[in-house]
Amino acid sequence: MAVIQALLAFYGLVAKTPLMHYKLAAMAMMRLGSKGSLADLAVNAYGGWLYYVAPDRVWLQETLANHSILSLLSQDWPSLVIQPMFAPTDLEVLVGWTGVPASTDNLIDQWQDRSGTAYQSFLSSAKETVQAIKEAFETGDSLAIQSRLADYRHLLLQIEKHNTLSIETPALRELVTIAQAYQFEAKSSGAGGGDCGIAVGQGQGLKKELATAWQAAGITLVELEIGAPQRPSEEAGN
């Protein structure tokens, strides 16, 4: 996103909305062959908590090949949803880094090559779980957010077992186990297979203790502050 902003500044251009920033970055990543959801770009553009549904990749690839960037900036992107959310005031979030990088593209290739019906079933269940998390945000239910995060983790473990993949590495499993000991729920973040895990809990109670326990296990606490989301002046949707 910083590269996009630097290029805009260099050419004296302005992206007036977070959605425009997202679209520019998403088009660049698609041209580079990225297979991820592009959700990280939405978070960079908007900030804060988001409910995100990825755009129709087939449509985006075909349209990007046959239309100008300006044309895509002005169009609605099918399936794309970027909705700012506000977290319950008692929701606590920690992110831990296991010290091992991971590749989203490589993992997606393995899933699509091996999964078939199981992969599609996972996608359907994951969509339902994410929708439940969204509803928990809307009602301010921190405990439901924790519970649904745990559900999503179990979906990942099922698809991991079905495909003999390495989504939850031993280090990530330890991250989760430690989090649960301090009344948090946790799961791998992003592609899995290494990298980071995210933990959510309720209230300030054991947050510091969890951070200390992670660090004792060789898990690096990622310092972060989740700001208020920007309110878009145009809607992202279909």
Q: Locations of the language-model features?
A:
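Stable alpha-helical structural segments in soluble proteins, enriched in small hydrophobic residues
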Residues: 2-11
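C-terminal nucleotide
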Residues: 10-16, 23-35, 41-188, 198-238
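Glycine-rich nucleotide-binding loop
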Residues: 192-194
